[in-house]
Amino acid sequence: MANYFNTLNLREKLDQLGRCRFMDRSEFADGCNFLKGKKIVIVGCGAQGLNQGLNMRDSGLDIAYALRAEAIAEKRASFTRATENGFKVGTYQELIPTADLVINLTPDKQHSKVVADVMPLMKQGAAFGYSHGFNIVEQGEQIRKDITVVMTAPKCPGTEVREEYKRGFGVPTLIAVHPENDPKGEGMAIAKAWASATGGDRAGVLESSFVAEVKSDLMGEQTILCGMLQAGSIVCYDKLVADGKDPAYASKLIQYGWETITEALKQGGITLMMDRLSNSAKIRAFELAEEIKVQLNDLYLKHMDDIISGEFSSTMMADWANGDANLFKWREETGKTAFENSPKADGIKISEQEYFDNGVVMVAMVKAGVEMAFDAMVASGIYEESAYYESLHELPLIANTIARKRLYEMNVVISDTAEYGNYLFSHVATPILAEKLIPMLQKGDLGEPTPTVEIDNVYLRDINDAIRNHPVELIGQELRGYMTDMKRIAVGD
């Protein structure tokens, strides 16, 4: 199979990368009615598989899970999750032939095998769904021409898909129809109904393309969403301990600091996050962010280039063929870092404001990272709406996983594809930050408040203007207007 994106001519590539339309609420007036009465079979019962299925069932749809015979016989975790939640479970042979919609929610590396196994069993004219287009775009999977191929991609981990639904809301979602597979013209109706059933229409839906989803998703998760948080956690913890801070305090400041700081992003973007700082600290955070851009922008652009060209996917798939040797090695190395093995902060109290006051360089890393990722995507032809969701919007959700069990939890919750890309980025970013940024830090940049300095009103005005007028802030203000019912995730205590 050839990389689908690389088979397109330049005009087709630009067209697919630029597919992005924010859909009006009225387009979801029928909810998920198009799928009611139809048999929906989900293949895979991991985080996305289970939680999307729970939401869809609660929305009135007929959901069952098709698992491999050995997974059922051995009562593996996927079987246990599905059965304990009261779902019908069967083998591919038992459930696929009568399914109207088969949704493949297995890990990326399993997609080709799943397609090979289920495609011969699917009835004429059925539909096949993905929540990530890697198999179609990067592997060039060819799907039977009578089958409609759609994507509904919630922009957060599976656990949050469920939690937001239970709160009566949802998470922003990208939907798409594969242009090579829409024989009956029903693809968009299927994707819209699926998105509505998971709660996505309550938070905002972008009509996108498989190409735009994949390229922007890979960029976001490799850089700001995971790679930057991992690199930042490691270097900031090491710096705090080297400066004589209590390791337990340092651990808590980092582990819960990302979550607390990025909660402000969810409610009011980079502007609100920066406004949580004193004027002296805001100026310092802005200056540090500009320095971080100088140090890391070339790395951000390299990741974007490798994603667009297919170099990243071919490198990762070579590791798949080698039994994930690099992935497992890097995962083990992460588990041995000082931050991951730092003591628990039992009894240590940190107020919400203290996370901002004592984490100025962390705020700077978030600001710089979001803006670099957003700018790199937009410069590559990805629309601002997609770039926003794949950078700023998802960041609080990923930070929340670190608050639960540090980097281990983040890397467990994200996909293997995201984890692999995270390691590629953080392995380069960590030494750059350690060798160039950390030696530049001053008193008050990390671990204690920024000293008050005299403020030049014009300089502060210009900084505020620069923060508020960055394109990620302008589009973010528009998109957050749709999400008026957003609930707070959490703040550290």
UniProtKB/Swiss-Prot annotation:
- The UniProt record lists the KARI C-terminal knotted domain at 209-345, 346-486
Question: Which Pfam family, any one, appears in the UniProt record?
Answer: KARI_N
Q: What is this protein called?
A: Ketol-acid reductoisomerase (NADP(+))
Report the pathway entry: Amino-acid biosynthesis; L-isoleucine biosynthesis; L-isoleucine from 2-oxobutanoate: step 2/4; Amino-acid biosynthesis; L-valine biosynthesis; L-valine from pyruvate: step 2/4
Q: Which cysteines are joined by disulfide bonds?
A: none
The record's comment on protein family reads: Belongs to the ketol-acid reductoisomerase family.
**UniProt-annotated binding residues for Mg(2+) 2:** D217, E390, E394
> Which part of the chain is the KARI N-terminal Rossmann domain?
14-208
List, from the UniProt record, the residues annotated as the active site of this protein. Answer: H132
The catalysed reaction is: (2R)-2,3-dihydroxy-3-methylbutanoate + NADP(+) = (2S)-2-acetolactate + NADPH + H(+); (2R,3R)-2,3-dihydroxy-3-methylpentanoate + NADP(+) = (S)-2-ethyl-2-hydroxy-3-oxobutanoate + NADPH + H(+)
The family database entries (InterPro entries) matched by this protein are listed as: 6-PGluconate_DH-like_C_sf, 6PGD_dom2, KARI, KARI_C, KARI_N, NAD(P)-bd_dom_sf
Where along this sequence does the record place binding of substrate? Answer: S415
Q: What does this protein do?
A: Involved in the biosynthesis of branched-chain amino acids (BCAA). Catalyzes an alkyl-migration followed by a ketol-acid reduction of (S)-2-acetolactate (S2AL) to yield (R)-2,3-dihydroxy-isovalerate. In the isomerase reaction, S2AL is rearranged via a Mg-dependent methyl migration to produce 3-hydroxy-3-methyl-2-ketobutyrate (HMKB). In the reductase reaction, this 2-ketoacid undergoes a metal-dependent reduction by NADPH to yield (R)-2,3-dihydroxy-isovalerate.
Q: What organism, scientifically named, is this protein from?
A: Glaesserella parasuis serovar 5 (strain SH0165)
> Which amino acids does the record list as binding Mg(2+) 1?
D217, E221
GO cellular component, as recorded: cytosol
Give the highest taxon in the source lineage: Bacteria
The enzyme's E.C. designation = 1.1.1.86
Tell me which cofactor or cofactors this protein depends on: Mg(2+)
Give this protein's Gene Ontology molecular function annotations: ketol-acid reductoisomerase activity; magnesium ion binding
Q: What class of enzyme is it?
A: oxidoreductase
Keywords, comma-separated and alphabetical? Amino-acid biosynthesis, Branched-chain amino acid biosynthesis, Magnesium, Metal-binding, NADP, Oxidoreductase, Repeat
GO BP: isoleucine biosynthetic process; L-valine biosynthetic process
Q: Which gene encodes it?
A: ilvC
Q: What is the lineage of its organism?
A: Bacteria, Pseudomonadati, Pseudomonadota, Gammaproteobacteria, Pasteurellales
> What's noted on cofactor binding?
Binds 2 magnesium ions per subunit.
HAMAP family reported for this sequence: IlvC
